[in-house]
Each structure stands twice: as C-alpha cells, then as structure tokens.
Amino acid sequence: MEPVDPNIEPWNQPGSQPKTACNQCYCKKCCYHCQLCFLQKGLGICYGREKRRQRTTTPYASKNHKDPIPKQPLPQARGDPTGPKESKKEVESKTKTDP
C-alpha cells in the first residue's frame, strides 16, 4: 500500500485513523471501530500495564481456614483402675450371700 503523500508519516495519512474517538462501548459497531478497538474489545488483547488484583475473601471462606483442629479426648488407660477392686468386692459379696 503506497502512502498518499510521502512527506506525511504513515500514521497521519488520510484514512489511517477513524474520525471518531475510541470509547468504552463494547457493541459490535464499536468493536470494529479501529484495529486497536478490535484487539482490545473484540479479542480481549491488551498490551497495557497490568494492575495488581486484590484478593477478595469472603468471611465464610476465611472462617473455614481459621478453624482450630477439634480437640480429641485424652487417651485413657485400658480398664478402670478402680474397676477390678470393685468387681472383686462385688464377687466376694455375691459369694457370701449365695451359700
């Protein structure tokens, strides 16, 4: 494509830029407004500086992560230490009453 006027830069040639300015509308007509609009709006390609995104946390999600581990009951020794003594007493009392 030959420039119309060789003394003018290619980006200033007639027809190289649209007559209307770019806008924030995403309709079909505005997406095909110019090459820049097509890349950004139509294809979603933007070569600009990316902004940092802040994490959005919900109170429900943060609550789940902060729950402490449920406490487990303390391990108990097998058999009750007072159990065998009582059972012996019960056996002795039963044997005494039975004869």
UniProtKB/Swiss-Prot annotation:
InterPro entries noted in UniProt: IV_Tat, Tat_dom_sf
Crosslink (Glycyl lysine isopeptide (Lys-Gly) (interchain with G-Cter in ubiquitin)) position: K71
Alphabetical UniProt keywords: Acetylation, Activator, AIDS, Apoptosis, Host cytoplasm, Host nucleus, Host-virus interaction, Inhibition of host innate immune response by virus, Inhibition of host interferon signaling pathway by virus, Interferon antiviral system evasion, Isopeptide bond, Metal-binding, Methylation, Modulation of host chromatin by virus, Modulation of host PP1 activity by virus, Phosphoprotein, RNA-binding, Secreted, Transcription, Transcription regulation, Ubl conjugation, Viral immunoevasion, Zinc
Record PTM N6-acetyllysine, positions in chain: K28, K51
Subcellular location: Host nucleus, Host nucleolus; Host cytoplasm; Secreted
Asymmetric dimethylarginine found at: R52, R53
HAMAP family: HIV_TAT
Function: Transcriptional activator that increases RNA Pol II processivity, thereby increasing the level of full-length viral transcripts. Recognizes a hairpin structure at the 5'-LTR of the nascent viral mRNAs referred to as the transactivation responsive RNA element (TAR) and recruits the cyclin T1-CDK9 complex (P-TEFb complex) that will in turn hyperphosphorylate the RNA polymerase II to allow efficient elongation. The CDK9 component of P-TEFb and other Tat-activated kinases hyperphosphorylate the C-terminus of RNA Pol II that becomes stabilized and much more processive.
Full protein name: Protein Tat
Organism ancestry: Viruses, Riboviria, Pararnavirae, Artverviricota, Revtraviricetes
